[in-house]
Amino acid sequence: MAKKSMIAREVKRKKLVKKYAAKRKSLLDEFNAAKDPMERLEIHRKIQGLPRNSAPNRVRNRCWATGKPRGVYRDFGLCRNQLRQRAHNGELPGVVKSSW
């Protein structure tokens, strides 16, 4: 189980990403459309002025059951251990043990 502070930090990051997504996208579109280097520099400074945790690449996928940051399957949002345990218990519909 991950520390509660780490889980809370990730929740905060997700909220910030959602809050600033439109502003960040509009600034990036302006940046890509700008031709003048000075104009690009000014827009870049505005992008840098946004909160650091509002960047989507800072969000880490975590298991929703345990909060573990590694070995998380995107389709289920579960870490590998929880995925295996819940699949064996039949809690994940459509997931069957492989045999050939």
Curated annotation (Swiss-Prot):
Q: Which domain of life is it from?
A: Bacteria
Q: Which UniProt keywords apply?
A: Ribonucleoprotein, Ribosomal protein, RNA-binding, rRNA-binding
Pfam family for this entry, one? Ribosomal_S14
One GO MF term on file is: structural constituent of ribosome
Biological process per Gene Ontology, one example term: translation
Presence of the UniProt keyword Acetylation in the record: no
Gene3D superfamilies, sorted? 1.10.287.1480
Give the signal sequence positions.
Answer: none
Transmembrane helix: present as a keyword of the record?
no
Q: Which GO terms describe its cellular component?
A: cytoplasm; small ribosomal subunit
State the function annotated in the UniProt record.
Binds 16S rRNA, required for the assembly of 30S particles and may also be responsible for determining the conformation of the 16S rRNA at the A site.
* Family from the record: Belongs to the universal ribosomal protein uS14 family.
Supply the PANTHER family for this chain: 30S RIBOSOMAL PROTEIN S14, SMALL RIBOSOMAL SUBUNIT PROTEIN US14M
Q: How does it assemble?
A: Part of the 30S ribosomal subunit. Contacts proteins S3 and S10.
Report what the protein is called.
Small ribosomal subunit protein uS14
Which organism does this sequence originate in?
Answer: Prochlorococcus marinus (strain MIT 9215)
Query: Gene name, please?
Result: rpsN
